[in-house]
């Protein structure tokens, strides 16, 4: 449903086509709020990948609607927020109770989102050697230097990406 063609989905469902959580996920990733709303109103299941897909696709309005309507989220949601590079979205997710883990810092480093990494660390987000590996893999020397200067660990795998 990344194409966002509501009438096609409606026709498919009226003619017995099955659906699952992927329908909501792809509608969210494509930013097709009307499709997502119709799917949910008609019993389509969703899961935490719907919220992650909304953020991965950069669709903050879709995320807000999904959360307001009970869609679950998890640590992958904050990781997905990093790909869009929108600090205010990450801040909103955290302020609204979205969990995070060391992948959040690693994804910020990989994408070169220095400000997001700094904010995450200043707000207690964990990190590990995957953060330094991701910075090196992404070619973000400034991020790597900052992470090391602030105590981020590394190991022999840091230079192996």
Language-model region placement:
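Ankyrin repeat (ANK) tandem alpha-helical domains that serve as protein-protein interaction scaffolds
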Residues: 1-161
